[in-house]
Amino acid sequence: RVLFRSYMAVIDGQLVVPCGTQLPALFNLASGKLEKYTTGWGGRVGLPKGTWFVAGSGQLLSHSGDLYDMRRPNDEKFANSGNRRDFKSKLYPGFMTRIQVEPTNQKSIGDFRRPVLSNNTMFYTDNGIVAEDISEIKLTPRQADPRRDQDKYPDKWQASFPRRWKLETDLRVRIQAGNRVYCTAPGKVAAIDLPAADGQPRISWEATIDGDPLTLVAANGRLFVTTRQGRLYAFGASAAPEPVTHARAAHTGNNSSEQVKLITAATGISKGYCLVLGLDNGELAEALSQQFTVIAIDNDADRINRLRSRWHGLGIYGTHITALLGDPLTYNLPPFLANLVVTETARLFNAEAAAEPPANIYHALRPYGGTACLPVALKGRQVWKDSAAKLSNAQVRESGRWLLLSRTGALAQSADWSHAAGGSGNSGSSEDRYLRGPLGLLWYDGSIRWERQPGKTEVRVAGGRIFVRADRMLAIDVFTGRRLWDQPLPQAAGAGKVGEFVATADAIYVAAGRSCVVLDARTGKQRSQFQMPEKIGGSLVHLRLWKNYLVSYLGKTVICLDRQSGQLLWSFEASRPELSLAVGGQRVFISELLNTRRGETIEKSGVKTYALDIATGKQAWQGAGGAELRYSETHDLLLTATAIYKGLDGTVHRKSVIADPTKDKWNYKSSGYIAGDSLLIGGSDNFTMYQLTSGVQLTKKISWFRRGCTPLRTSPYMVTTRYQGQAAYIDLDTMQFQSLWNLRGACSNNIFPANGILNVPNLSGGCTCNYTPTSMALVPRTTLQAQPKK
């Protein structure tokens, strides 16, 4: 639950660890025990917020520009708590008292002060450099500050310290070393001599630099300065010789590079994660690291240490290549990791040593084409082929001296989240039956943060890729979190300009005003652009893709295009522009929506639901409209405001209102979510589950406290939501909640059950709450370890 970030500090006998946007964590130095801690709050005006900075002296802790007394327990209370439980005192680091509040620490954190603290003096920047005596603390009840007159959560106490001196300057104090403090300004570094008691400071020297100073370190009689632009400066009492540049060792020769070319040609794989199971001289692994992220495994400790040293010297260890000590054939590898598996040690795969594929190899291969390229002896290959025939989506082929074992296609019974509401049926669910609880962590990453608000960021999951559309389109590997590509979008297709996009394994269709932009799913590059017919007005919204048909509407006109050519196949005129679309089972379903603000009713408005043949656009049947449509292609059932219909012919499968509720409890007013074989009726913080086909009630009504606006997403065995402020999922097998502790659920719900993975991209941008800004992926725990052969 605690994510360590940046530099730690030992203050008042405790280890203080900054945790990024989380509040800092305090650990007992002797035992390592985590002290009192809270997170997942903040965002309110004036409440503590996490950053990378901690510093301290004596009993004082500085964090985010705020100052805390580590020995004074917090006794804060909400100004408006009423009769509810008051937990304000627990919203501070270590539940200790904040005695000074950084003026910029309001709704969001501005450029907060980073004071320098010595044994009895605090130096900080406030329209100059100020020095105060922190050995004398004067604590008084806080008076209302004009900058916080709208603050519902004011602190009780305010500390003040006797001022030693103030130096009027544009410099900012950064560090103290000896009897000087060192300061910076854009393009400038300076040293200030500290005065004796009652004296005044003076600037000892100044120097100009190229760029904006970022960090300072004083050591060995020198001051080292880095800049934001990537330069390094050193200052000292006397001139120093030119720094020695240590040349990196040369990469390996052409033999291994040629072998890499042969391997990539045989497999068709040229990037991603590569496992090297068994090392010899490390040359093949090293050559592969120029294209792949390589993880090499060998059971010879001396060889591992020798190669680690070499790769450190090349500057590639830990970034391009990693070496692990262990048995290459039994090492406990994570699932779905490897795009490519090779070896430097052919003897591991001769007929005697590996009579059949080791379980961890196929287990580690990435779906959608991960391939092991291994020198399996000819007489042993039939056993590998027989073994692969028993595995789901395994394929074996031969290429000269190599046997190629691939994991093709998707995980069995997994499904995409290709549309805004799951699939083309607008069910609010994916059809993913691979993903089933309990779940375990597959990967996490905090390098990217997208906006959390609905419409600012759109996410789809298809073909083993997470597609994120903000002002650009970016693709991430579902199974590893690896960034695949990042491409700009045409201006009309940027965030906030248009509606949805649809993703498949091969293409992405982006609604872009009067056109539909088609991107290649593998590269992100534009493949084509379909212009809308001039005779049809309006902008393209709410795309639906089913097989070779692309359905959408402009204004009141529903259109169907050939998804390959963009040719208009047919159009249909509805009575109003407020429509809901669901597509599947050879049908296009169109519901004309009610305007509830005007008090419209289904009976008086005459709104309709139409079912059209997707190939011709001819009407198959019609019924009453009024609400969002949900369609299950598996069961050919269409959920509307008045009934559940058979999609093919419009036969009423079940009405929404039961004449005699004493005999049948089925009743609903909203369309709910179709989750596999179940129907979930309720809202964003409650539902009752029914069997879709029979209407039998499966569970009592379940409800929970979200503390946020996250709507539901579903799959046959999962519901994703926000629970007590945390991102969470509900296991529909057990009806148990599982919080993803300290992870924020986005306003638009950032938890997508698809491709066999619970995908959680980091949609927390613009949030000032102290959650961990992290993307992650979870899988069924049963898949985390390779299953031994019986």
Show which residues each predicted segment covers.
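Conserved class I S-adenosyl-L-methionine
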Residues: 269-287, 293-295
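Conserved SAM-binding strand-loop segment of SAM-dependent methyltransferases
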Residues: 316-328
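Aromatic (tryptophan-biased) beta-strands that constitute blades/sheets of beta-rich domains
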Residues: 1-4, 33-45, 49, 69-114, ...
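Conserved SAM-binding loop
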Residues: 307-308
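Repeat-blade elements of multi-bladed beta-propeller folds
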Residues: 4-24, 42-68, 80-96, 110-129, ...
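A short glycine-rich, Lys/Arg-flanked "PGG" loop and its adjoining helix->strand segment in the class I
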Residues: 351-370
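A short acidic, Gly/Pro-enriched loop at the edge of an enzyme's catalytic core
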Residues: 329-340
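A short SAM/SAH-binding and catalytic strip from SAM-dependent methyltransferases
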Residues: 338-354
